[in-house]
UniProtKB/Swiss-Prot annotation:
Localization of this protein: Cytoplasm
Source organism: Pseudomonas aeruginosa (strain ATCC 15692 / DSM 22644 / CIP 104116 / JCM 14847 / LMG 12228 / 1C / PRS 101 / PAO1)
Protease is among the record's keywords: yes
This protein's GO CC annotations: cytoplasm; HslUV protease complex; proteasome core complex
Regulation: Allosterically activated by HslU binding.
Keyword field: Allosteric enzyme, Cytoplasm, Hydrolase, Metal-binding, Protease, Sodium, Threonine protease
NCBIfam families associated with the record: ATP_dep_HslV (TIGR03692), PRK05456.1 (NF003964)
InterPro entries in the record: ATP-dep_Prtase_HsIV_su (IPR022281), Ntn_hydrolases_N (IPR029055), Proteasome_sua/b (IPR001353), Proteasome_suB-type (IPR023333)
Gene: hslV
Membrane-spanning intervals of the chain: none
Protein name: ATP-dependent protease subunit HslV
Primary localization class, coarse: cytoplasm
Domain of life: Bacteria
Length: 177
């Protein structure tokens, strides 16, 4: 499993993830890159779930971004429709977090496209821990940057969740929101 966190604050949007890949109860890799930039560096995307499935979804999402000239919401809705109705895609087990300067979204295989409250996404096995940490930091420390909130939340999740480590990949964009 994994932990992915995205935070919007003070004109920035940040997305980060840990690097652990597990097979059952065994750590197979500790430095996987689960967050990346798509569509000419304008979109951040991260995944939780089966790695091979996530790469398929990244590829499909990037195709939708190209098809819709980088329009994040439209591309997300079209991917969710395909994911739900295409027989081969419907068996994929992963979730995507995507963000650009305007919006942050979670895309699921159930056809859900959700824009979370507070500009905060936290998902994966350590998502609950990371969400609690990030919300506390956002509500009680106005001086921390989006990057500092995301990094701290991921490190806290990595210290609690056995399927999350503290080898982080963090990407950042300027935000319109």
């Amino acid at each position: 499993m994994t932990t992915i966190v995205s935070v919007r604050r003070n004109g920035k949007v940040v997305m980060g993830g840990d690097g652990q890949v597990s097979l059952g109860n065994t750590v197979m890799k500790g430095n996987a890159k689960k967050v990346r930039r798509l569509y000419h560096g304008q979109v951040l995307a991260g995944f939780a779930g089966a790695t091979a499935d996530a790469f398929t979804l990244f590829e499909r999402f990037e195709q939708q971004l190209e098809k819709h000239q980088g329009h994040l919401v439209r591309a997300a809705v079209e991917l969710a429709k395909d994911w739900r109705t295409d027989r081969s895609l419907s068996r994929l087990e992963a979730m995507l977090a995507v963000a650009n300067k305007d919006a942050s979204l979670i895309i699921t295989g159930n056809g859900d496209v959700v824009e979370p409250e507070h500009g905060l996404i936290a998902m994966g096995s350590g998502g609950g821990f990371a969400q609690a940490a990030a919300l506390a930091l956002l509500q009680h420390n106005a001086e921390l940057s989006a990057r500092e909130v995301a990094e701290t939340a991921l490190n806290i999740a990595g210290s609690i969740c056995v399927f999350t480590n503290q080898n982080l990949t963090i990407e950042e964009l300027d935000s319109a929101v």
